[in-house]
Amino acid sequence: MSIKSILCIFDGTEKELGALDTSFSLAETYAARVRILHVSPTPSSYVGIYGEGVIESSYVIAAIEKENKERLERAEQYVKSFAARHNVPLGDKNNFITNDKTNNAVAEFVHLVGDVENIVAEQGRLSDIIVVARGVKDPNAVYDSAIISAIFNTGRPVLLMPKGKSEKTAKWSCKNISLAWDGGLEAARAMYNSLPFLKHADKVQLLTARGEGEACDLEAEEGVIKYLQCHGIHANGIIIAAGSRTPAEALLMRAKELKSDLLVMGAYGHSRFREMILGGLTNHMLEAADIPLLLLH
């Protein structure tokens, strides 16, 4: 897998600037095109939150349109600022810039109006990787639906970045990677799609979480290590006793202890992973880990 088309979902908040900065850095590292997608939801997107009768109010419609305009203007300013900071040419639908001849990073700001989940699904399928910030509290749940759609409706790897401002601009650096492995299809796909990152890493750990009484399949783990060696990647296998924790919690805690720059893992069931990302005890663990996650469903 090569990375030549990056999609960054960006709502225009300060908490997403780390994800935006990472998207530009990835584009520079892989001489890729980064498309920054900003979606303005239609009033109908809020029916499930406020009710159909409320949404039909002209006052509510005007308020939504005003908020959409302010978000769009804020997002555009941030994107222009980061493009200039990274010295990456920025285009839009009226000024398409190609990187065929220069073989350098290029960027495009994409603004679309409509249903957030559908737009993210359609645009995400036309990318090699999707970058989005996690833990951005959205009272209207629109941003939440964008994250869920990216993970479960695109078939593409999603780089879920910790929320926060960008402290500095630097080339993408991911030298210490932890790879979660349970032998399942999702884990296998996540491993394959993370190969571009694994090949550039100085240190790779293969993490396997085991519950109480579960046997360790050392032969299967050795098979994974040999597969990675075929790609020039040398990994160290680590077995984790989950104990009273869930496997996800155990993996995240160990990845943090190992000072990992990235944790690669498969996204399992829809409802289970929705809880991991958006709420509940596991979300607390995600916040505590404070490391990027590369997910694939």
Residue ranges, per PLM feature:
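Short, small-residue-enriched loops and turns at beta-alpha junctions
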Residues: D138-P139, E167, E212-C216, A242-R245, ...
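Small/aliphatic-rich secondary-structure junction motif
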Residues: M1-I61, N153, W172-I240
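Intrinsically disordered or low-complexity boundary/linker segments at protein termini
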Residues: M1-G18, L90-N104, E108, V120-L207, ...
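A short acidic, glycine-rich active-site loop
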Residues: S57-R74
